[in-house]
Amino acid sequence: MTHTVKTIPDMLIETYGNQTEVARRLSCHRNTVRRYLYDKEARYHAIVNGVLMIHQGGRGIYDRNQH
């Protein structure tokens, strides 16, 4: 089985910049597409076999002294 890995900027090239079409293909909101619009190196997201995978950073133990 072959796996395809893409990014949202790659899909925008395929859809000629249509963010709504990318959101429809990924079954997500258009604002989610806008959030990862400039993540060309796939540091925070990846599309594997047509499924959007997102890095959920910043979660964990709340440190009271940081705020």
Swiss-Prot record:
It comes from the Viruses. InterPro entries: Homeodomain-like_sf (IPR009057), Phage_NinH (IPR010454). Belongs to the ninH family. This is Protein ninH. It comes from Salmonella phage P22 (Bacteriophage P22).
